[in-house]
Amino acid sequence: MTQFEDKFMEVQASMVSLALEYVQNQADKIFIYAIADSLYSFNLFYEIKGNIVHKHLVNDFLPTKSHIDTSLQSLLLKEGVKDVKSMLDVCQEYNREHPTEMWLIYDAKKNSLDSRYSYEGRYDKDEELLPRLEFEKWFEEVKEQDL
């Protein structure tokens, strides 16, 4: 692998690590949606014990003794945005086009990462497109597939 690919993978691994840390490594899968377009955004949801779960509801699916502090959500998202910006820095350092959207799915059981990237710049082109709505759309798609 090239240095660029190594560094790019490091940033993605950092995103996954951050997401795992939030749930104390208790998720089966992590779904990360990141944007680096006319805005920066980072959001995620989980699969825990076969349930597709928003980050603020993870305690509903974790054992009581291992509940997490959901007040850390804003810190989680801020750190995620830092990783998105790091990804941009890596792409600029190697003079590579950066993805404007990323969909990452980490399977903790298999220790595998599936990724999909878009380079379209949809948010730059469409002022009515909202990250929250696109994130919710993906959440619902995954939830329907999982049933």
Question: For the regions a protein language model found, what residue spans apply to each?
Answer:
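Exposed alpha-helical structural elements
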Residues: 14, 83-86, 134
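Low-complexity, flexible helical/coil segments
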Residues: 65-72, 82, 137-143
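Amphipathic protein-protein interaction modules
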Residues: 73-123
